[in-house]
Amino acid sequence: MGQGDESERIVINVGGTRHQTYRSTLRTLPGTRLAWLAEPDAHSHFDYDPRADEFFFDRHPGVFAHILNYYRTGKLHCPADVCGPLYEEELAFWGIDETDVEPCCWMTYRQHRDAEEALDSFGGAPLDNSADDADADGPGDSGDGEDELEMTKRLALSDSPDGRPGGFWRRWQPRIWALFEDPYSSRYARYVAFASLFFILVSITTFCLETHERFNPIVNKTEIENVRNGTQVRYYREAETEAFLTYIEGVCVVWFTFEFLMRVIFCPNKVEFIKNSLNIIDFVAILPFYLEVGLSGLSSKAAKDVLGFLRVVRFVRILRIFKLTRHFVGLRVLGHTLRASTNEFLLLIIFLALGVLIFATMIYYAERIGAQPNDPSASEHTHFKNIPIGFWWAVVTMTTLGYGDMYPQTWSGMLVGALCALAGVLTIAMPVPVIVNNFGMYYSLAMAKQKLPKKKKKHIPRPPQLGSPNYCKSVVNSPHHSTQSDTCPLAQEEILEINRAGRKPLRGMSI
């Protein structure tokens, strides 16, 4: 039978657009939905119009044109004017494996999935800005029970494994948690966020002022020491921080402690809470203050040693600046950008390490050319006494800082220095655009999620019922073997899960 035979032609109406092809074309991909149309009993299993002699599918006509071309040419391309999830659903419906997408279109196809993963990573970002109208009844009031459950899942990833029974806990636990965790959940949550931001800024300001000599006057102190035959008085001078700064820091720590305890108590998932790096920073920044206050009244040598150590580790208080990431989207975007650009940073470090090693060696030997004949070390006239010293100069030069503490003094060394500076500019410039693009992508996604209106009711189409045109066949008289039984076709949702998991289903699977 030739391809030009009228009986070999088949008409497929997809969303009102008629497509004509040959049955032999549809047979090129066995086990798919279109391949079943080429079988003799297809009229009884699909929506077939005998008067128009066509099969009808209520699907996207534009995407189907690309899928049909895949049967004709063997190359699957992704349309640029179709959203990625829609194209993914269409591939699953027609039984096409996503890994068949051509390499030229793979990045376009994957873009939507990367965007979804990025949006999920901003779990603490607000989903709507209309909470002012819904929070008049109480703190963290986000609507009915479904809204509270959605808020809890969005902020805490799961329900509490140790949730307490009773209506009070079930009603107020997600509200109090949102009050301290999500500044955009309600008006009262914004008040808490402003208070937290105020104490963070005050604490950091106090930390900086404590290092100024104006607030560290020198005072004379005496200490009675026990000696072998009695006691003796020892006089010494010591810098002592102004008391009002300590009181201010104490007030800030009281607030941070209250905030931390409330978040611990009302957290739906204690394990996830403990694993969170920001929560670890909160605890580490609070603990030294209480240890210092508790040991300040002791006079033993061990207590004084511990106090001295705690004064040294006061710098951990500056880590509270990272608490601002809960309140500013831009800081969260920066954190996600740094994590997403790990490969680029590693590449930059490798390039710099190679350049530093090469140019430190070159400058060392280049400077030795101008050595005096009576100089046995050949290094009295230059700063570059050895190659390790040249590492510092190479780093400063390649990063275009140029402190000027070390510089070449011979014409050959100057030539190496010029090459080092040019190489540094080119090396740093290569990965920077990728990092900037990542920041722009994450920032736009964060802004999109922040302004995304809350969906009150999501449209979910009815699944295909047995006997409907979109329901796949229960019995397939196909000569092609299948890994599944004909009475258990692979659902469209399962195809989506397989594609997202990166597993490649066999071509013979029933769809």
From Swiss-Prot:
Superkingdom, natural source: Eukaryota
A cellular component annotation (GO) from this entry: dendrite membrane
Glycosylated position list: N220, N229
Gene Ontology BP, a term: cellular response to xenobiotic stimulus
Keyword set, alphabetical order: Cell membrane, Cell projection, Disease variant, Epilepsy, Glycoprotein, Ion channel, Ion transport, Membrane, Neurodegeneration, Phosphoprotein, Potassium, Potassium channel, Potassium transport, Synapse, Transmembrane, Transmembrane helix, Transport, Voltage-gated channel
Subcellular location(s) of the protein: Cell membrane; Cell projection, Axon; Presynaptic cell membrane
Acidic residues composition-biased segments: 130-147
CDD domains for this protein: BTB_KCNC1_3
SUPFAM superfamilies on file: POZ domain, Voltage-gated potassium channels
Catalysed reactions, semicolon-separated: K(+)(in) = K(+)(out)
Post-translational modification: N-glycosylated; contains sialylated glycans.
Cytoplasmic side: 1-190, 268-276, 332-344, 437-511
InterPro entries: BTB/POZ_dom (IPR000210), Ion_trans_dom (IPR005821), K_chnl_volt-dep_Kv (IPR003968), K_chnl_volt-dep_Kv3 (IPR003974), K_chnl_volt-dep_Kv3.1 (IPR005403), SKP1/BTB/POZ_sf (IPR011333), T1-type_BTB (IPR003131), VG_K_chnl (IPR028325)
Keyword Chaperone: no
Molecular function terms from GO: delayed rectifier potassium channel activity; kinesin binding; transmembrane transporter binding; voltage-gated monoatomic ion channel activity involved in regulation of presynaptic membrane potential; voltage-gated potassium channel activity
Binding site for K(+): T400, L401, G402, Y403
TM spans (from-to): 191-209, 248-267, 277-295, 309-331, 345-366, 415-436
A Pfam family reported for this protein in Swiss-Prot or TrEMBL: Ion_trans
Family the entry assigns: Belongs to the potassium channel family. C (Shaw) (TC 1.A.1.2) subfamily. Kv3.1/KCNC1 sub-subfamily.
Subunit structure, interactors included: Homotetramer. Homomultimer. Heteromultimer with KCNG3, KCNG4 and KCNV2. Heteromultimer with KCNC2. Heterotetramer with KCNC3. Interacts with the ancillary subunits KCNE1 and KCNE2; the interaction modulates channel activity.
UniProt remark on domains: The segment S4 is probably the voltage-sensor and is characterized by a series of positively charged amino acids at every third position. The N-terminal cytoplasmic T1 domain is involved but not required for Zn(2+)-mediated tetramerization.
Protein name per UniProt: Voltage-gated potassium channel KCNC1
Gene name tied to this protein: KCNC1
